[in-house]
Amino acid sequence: MEKLLNELSSENRPAYSVDSDVEIDAQIPENLKRSSGLGLPSITENDLSRHFTNLSRKNYALSTSFYPLGSCTMKYNPLINERVAKNEAFNFIHPYQPGKSMQGVLKIMYELEKDLCEISGMDCFSLQQAAGAHGEFTGLLIIAKYFKSIKQKRTKIIIPDTAHGTNPASAALAGFGTVSLKSESDGSILPEKLKKILTPEIAAVMLTVPNTLGAFEKNIPEISRIVHENGSLLYYDGANLNAVMGIVRPGDMGFDVMHINLHKTFSTPHGGGGPGSGPVGVKEFLEPFLPVPKIESRKSKFVLNYKKPKSIGKLKAFLGNFPVILKAYVYIKSLGAEGLKNVSEWAVLNANYMLARFKDKIDVPAGSRCMHEFVLSPKSLFKNNVKTLDVAKRLLDYGYYAPTIYFPLIVEEAVMLEPTETESKETMDAFIDTLIKIIYEEATQEPQKLKEAPFNTSVRRLNEVEAARNPVLKWKKA
């Protein structure tokens, strides 16, 4: 395991030296001097360079291997996006500049909003949101402000058990209570069941389409009808939009509010905490409630309009995570409408190919067809107290990033896989063969080996319970 910089430090080894004919220490007044040292590591530039190079070699990334993390859309990120984002014309812009001096930036954001409207079927967008959950929160604040404006007190949100995992937290943060809706065995929502819990208190129903089992919600027209008859709104969680671009549009299906994860569907690097971008789209009647400022085109110029009296206000400093916005813009312009449709078709094809190879060997809770991702449940195959966690840890030894496990919560010992459109048949076959080998051979013949895995990583299996209960989050000098 790589040592920390503080552990590599030596008090007797100067990190740098500067020739000077001035005694710098003598120039600082005594009352401004520190009484103790800063505690910064003293390390040579050579050792510092080696330290970070060694750390980089331990990284796992899309540029190194397959990343089948379900519900995360870990697709290849075209390097042309990075080249444009690093252009000095963008990097040297300051977010506090007046709008008239950054017309190019505002034009890109304005055009991206229009592109997202075309892709989604929504009428207006805000690009301010920093992540998907931030987008959910924004959408729910818009819903709350809308009902307040028409003097209706609606305090609850219906969330199916197949919804994206952040939905309940976003609803709570926005001041709503939540009502859970149990899905059917294939992950679908029965309109009759939904109708029974649609009361005057319900502000909205949040749906993830396709859902977290990888199934497309087949009853959306009926669901939309009964939700709107109740006076409620329909929210689309766009976490899985990569499955349906150019095929169906949420706005055409009856959804009133949605968010899109640019960092997932539109190929910007994500993971490790960000940066992300979760733009929010709404139908025309909700446009007045979007966050400020709104980018508008006036007489061939782009302006930032803060004069929106019904707006929920500003939710992020500046105008959003612009580098992510820029990369998504390049991705959309590079592919065009037909290219984006092909992305979704290939994503669904790849997922169904993998599912077809797995379905006769491992239980598939939601059936033999899927959209862009699917969930396996190897519970019935496990003997000797082997768990999904053990299989995931063992995959690391074979050079794979483990898929999403134990989600969705409605599937026991869940393994969630999303290959995306950018993986080859050979890559998928190699992963499938490895996972089957671990479950069918190693879990039966060498269960203890699985329970002790991984063996080839720089950090072995951690005591996750101890780490959660007694976290050590900072270095202390011995």
Curated annotation (Swiss-Prot):
One of its GO terms (molecular function) is pyridoxal phosphate binding. GO terms for cellular component: cytosol; glycine cleavage complex. InterPro entries: GcvPB (IPR023012), GDC-P_C (IPR049316), GDC-P_N (IPR049315), GDC_P (IPR020581), PyrdxlP-dep_Trfase (IPR015424), PyrdxlP-dep_Trfase_major (IPR015421), PyrdxlP-dep_Trfase_small (IPR015422). Pfam families: GcvP2_C, GDC-P. The keyword Transcription does not apply. The modification N6-(pyridoxal phosphate)lysine is found at residue 264. Keywords: Oxidoreductase, Pyridoxal phosphate. Its cofactor is pyridoxal 5'-phosphate. Coiled coil: none annotated. Its EC number is 1.4.4.2. One of its GO terms (biological process) is glycine decarboxylation via glycine cleavage system. It is an enzyme of class 1 (oxidoreductase). The glycine cleavage system catalyzes the degradation of glycine. The P protein binds the alpha-amino group of glycine through its pyridoxal phosphate cofactor; CO(2) is released and the remaining methylamine moiety is then transferred to the lipoamide cofactor of the H protein. The glycine cleavage system is composed of four proteins: P, T, L and H. In this organism, the P 'protein' is a heterodimer of two subunits. HAMAP family: GcvPB (MF_00713). This is Probable glycine dehydrogenase (decarboxylating) subunit 2. The gene is gcvPB.
